[in-house]
């Protein structure tokens, strides 16, 4: 069972899209195992986006992600990484598939509404960065056998 981090970034929160994103992921069959509405600290932002340090957009990215609250979530399910990334759409909203969150609501890459882990390894690392074990809930739904083999 894979776990993945999903962030609804400040633009998604400000536009009132938290419920829309959660609904799409739940309809997809994924299970929410952790969630918190939070203001991102400078330290957390710099750790999360360390891979981009030194790139021209880094300072703006850090300023943006710390500018307003985000909704941080951990989701779980078979193939959760791929399922979430499909549901969110390509990083650039203009290249995202119709029906994806970014296609339906985004216009620019700098305001692309969400972040989603891009690999199983990054999913594990990012969930651990944003959540303590005590903040994650292991549970099952009665309908899980109808979704998962």
Features from the language model and the residues they span:
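Non-catalytic terminal and connector segments of soluble metabolic enzymes
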Residues: 1-149
């Amino acid at each position: 069972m894979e776990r993945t981090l999903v962030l609804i970034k400040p633009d998604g929160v400000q536009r009132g899209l938290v419920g829309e994103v959660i609904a799409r992921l739940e309809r997809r069959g994924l299970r929410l195992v952790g969630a918190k509405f939070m203001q991102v600290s400078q330290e957390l932002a710099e750790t999360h986006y360390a891979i981009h340090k030194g790139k021209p957009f880094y300072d703006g990215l850090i300023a943006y992600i710390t500018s307003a609250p985000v909704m941080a979530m951990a989701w779980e399910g078979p193939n959760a990484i791929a399922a979430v990334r499909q549901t969110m759409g390509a990083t650039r909203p203009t290249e995202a598939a119709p029906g994806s969150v970014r296609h339906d609501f985004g216009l620019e890459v700098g305001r692309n509404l969400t972040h989603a882990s891009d690999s199983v390894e990054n999913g594990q690392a990012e969930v651990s960065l944003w959540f303590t074990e005590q903040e994650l809930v292991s549970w099952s739904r009665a309908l899980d056998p109808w979704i998962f083999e």
